[in-house]
Amino acid sequence: MEMTRVMMPCVRWLTLLGLISSNVVFGIQLQSLDVPFNGEGECALILDGPGKSSNFDYSLNLLRGSSLNYDGPNTCITFDAINAAYLDARKRIHVASPDDAHFKNEYVASVGELVFDISLNLAKTYGLSYQEIEKGLPLIDTSKTLIRDVCPAFLSNVECRAGKYRRYDGLCTNLEHPTWGASHTPFTRLLGPVYADGIQAPRISITGRPLPLARVVSRTIHPDEGYHDHAGTVMIIAWGQFMDHDYTLQGTPLDPLNKNDPEECCNRPAHLKHPYCNEIYIPEDDFFYKLFKVNCIDFVRTFPAPRPGCRLGSKVPFNTLTGVLDGNTVYGVTESHAKKLRMFEGGLLRMHPAFEHFGLKDLLPLKVEIPDEGCTRPNSSMYCFEAGEIRVNEQLVLACMHTLMAREHNRLAKGLAEINPHWDDETLFQEARRINIAIIQHVTYNEFLPILLGKDVMEKFGLTLQKQGYWDGYDSNVNPGVIDAFAAAAFRFGHSLLPTAVERWSKAHKFISSKRLSDLIRRPYDLFRAGVFDEYFMGLMNQVAQAMDDSITQEVTNHLFKKAGAKFGMDLVSFNMQRGREFGLPGYMEYRKFCGLPWSDRFEDMFQSMPNETIRKYSSIFEHPADIDLWSGGVSEKPLPGSILGPTFACIIATQFSYSRRGDRFWYELPNQPSSFTPEQLQEIRKVRLARLICDNTDLIDTVQLYPMVLPDHEINPRVPCKSGIIPSLDLSKWAHFPHEHAFQLNDILGK
């Protein structure tokens, strides 16, 4: 079944006044506009047809609300009409002040709401078709309307200068397209959105009826079966989540008290609910929640994004993080937050010397400002951690990864200070940051992605790293922005791998104990016990991950974010389904087609792609294979040979990582950039392995397997001593500013 069967088959032609540059997109003739703003009644957009004359399919019926009539062969949307819609929206929507932080969620969200309200007004008034909303409205030059008065400067007027160090907010990653890959910009799309009303309402069935409840899909398709993977360790989940939090965090209304949970929706009367409430309803016969008389889980929709130039169009959410791997988990996405994390001495990050008297390494700094944000505190004397990314305390294992890379930054800064004693704090910090980001990129593409995707997918999508020399693959035409299907579905693959309990192991690789995953969510307090950090890292390298399949642990389907003393929590799988639908993500089958995989019109045609029992379950709750949610179908697929993932998720994830590499002007392998490493420095970065990071940034661990994301094997993945020289170390002498003059000092410093 093709996308056009779901979308409307009949499209009216769009034409813009003026003849400067014309092109044809999806059969719609589009021409750029060159009209003075002050001309009364001038057309911003001309629709070929009298308006409201087409036959709309079910997904657009809700747009047909106006009684206006249009005569003649064309319909003109004037600048005056857009300004009138703007003034109407301003009566209801308050645009927040940017103050000194123009990337504040509240400010970006309020502008997005205003511009989207104008789009919705025009769509209803003129009865716009799907193609007119998606391809026509975005071509209107809103700088010639009153919208220009509120459009954030970072979306319309950015001046970039080539420099050695990347910005925290991701702006100017591309000099020609400064907002590409920047924080607080729209998610990109591989496929057009499928909204129930054509512009914003969550996706429904292709039959026009509602989809099965998200909780019904969760309990039917994704029960906890507890199968284990044969080779992958929990470390692959830990690194994957650390990467996910470098890439994606959608903007949503937050509870005013804890700043992390969604606004309360279920227990409020309709007139007091936040307009973004989109609750997850629980059936009365739910085997688990009925025990506690729970019939609703709080959930809120994402804010609409202001598009670059504040262009009009359908709702698209915004990403509060950047679209490139830039270590914002360590450093944050604003300069102001980065400053809060710094010591401003020796290029170091602030840390908490919890075990100074034991001679052990520091933990992350304590979160003393808004201490309840993202943290379940047993009492007022206990604190969670502060890091570059707000979700650092989401689960203890994630806090471990944040701690590891913060320690690595400080290790690098101290080493650089010894080699270059004339460097000031700023130079030391930025150089350590630059190297640390390169290490994160290298470990991700050299160790994580090959295990996740497999050799064939890596080669097909150009993800294989070079072993020598520079890689000159930067393409200024590639947008590294995060793909909506990646953020809302594909890169949530790790939920299938989550264990029921997280294990601690000794330095001798012996099991010590385990703790339920749900008891470690927003409760990282075990790390305040001396030596426990190392034990959890030993567990990450020795505990086998769950299998990649449709089975999801009850720790996150029934107990997610469980409150202290409670017997139930939320359902992460339902969240995934609800988020994908409200994003307007097309169904699983549409992405299979995009990736060159077979489309199935019948459930029985799916037997080669996933287990028969899973297909039988799908047929029991969905009306058509095209209705299956992307996340659900993606985790249920049979893995590709040599890969953890099935073909659909492998395709989407590989596409994203290809964009992130080819679209990043600061990518560590590139030549001829102000940020480029020397050939000698680049070869040093290529030496770095996750095993070395663990050896260098833990206290007592002295043996690790060469590839910690895979279970040890005495032949292909042996455990080796940290000090044996088998695991190479990065030689910071290649960063010496005066290498010849200080050669004798370097030999002493480095023990040569």
Question: What are the functions of these language-model segments?
Answer:
Residues M1-M8:
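N-terminal secretory signal peptides that target proteins for export/translocation
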Residues E2, M401, N576-M577:
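A generic structural signal for short
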Residues P9-L396, K414, I419-K752:
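Terminal regions of secretory-pathway proteins
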Residues Q395-R407:
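Alpha-helical bundle segments that constitute or directly flank the non-heme di-iron/ferroxidase center
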Residues A406-N410, L585:
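Hydrophobic faces of stable alpha-helices that mediate helix-helix packing
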